Curated annotation (Swiss-Prot):
Homodimer. Belongs to the purine nucleoside phosphorylase YfiH/LACC1 family. One of its GO terms (molecular function) is oxidoreductase activity. This is Purine nucleoside phosphorylase ML0918. It comes from Mycobacterium leprae (strain TN). Its cofactor is Cu(2+); Zn(2+). InterPro entries: Cu_polyphenol_OxRdtase, Cu_polyphenol_OxRdtase_sf, Cytotoxic_necrot_fac-like_cat.
Amino acid sequence: MGGFADTGQVSVRIRWVITMRAGGVLVSPFDFLDLGDHVGDDPDCGGHLSRAWLVAAIGLGVDRVVWMSQVHGDRVKVVHEPCDAVVDNTDALVTRTSQPALPVVTIHCVPVLLSDARPGVTAAVHVGEGRGSARCASPCDGYDAGPGCVRWRRDIAVLLGPAVSGRNYEVPVVIADGVEAASPDSCTTTRISAGTPGLDLRTGIACQFRDLGVMSIEDDPRRTVADRALFSHLQTVSTGRLASLVWME
């Protein structure tokens, strides 16, 4: 799944791509396009091979894609140029140059892609429940990190990618309460057991962005647990990871 953002009268266009299970060359349970590098498949023949396959399929060079090692934290890294090494202990990448393509790797957590075509800024953010709260690196803070970065948050466009739905995401009450305190509107009930608490992280994230003044928020309707075209460890214990990428052309 991919597309181009409407950038109006500007000199760059924003491109985003979200992968599915289809494509790639791997075998079950990582069939066929596992973009993770730590989920039990052979890292040399699994995730790394899939990553090379992906960047070739979408017409990017391997050296343009900057991967990060996500840790359910709040560290934002501003990227000035492509690099071969994985960016460690980071959950958000931001760039104001056209060279790096920024991916976020997920299964049930929320991939968040952000862009503002006028100043030429993009970001990829990993958001998930961690330690009883919705752990989110603040991409808006990252945008403000350097000269020429975004100054008006209302111009930022946000895409919330595929994630687990609240109806399938049962959590203990203490976790639900903690997430709701940090990210209002995240709590819901599940269909697993009537009345048990669940988390709809995308609703809570959208609420946070609106509170920050961001108005253009798009929500990919697909749910990882319910959609067999996507990976989910609630379908099978061992499984792969999806990738969501954003870059400028």
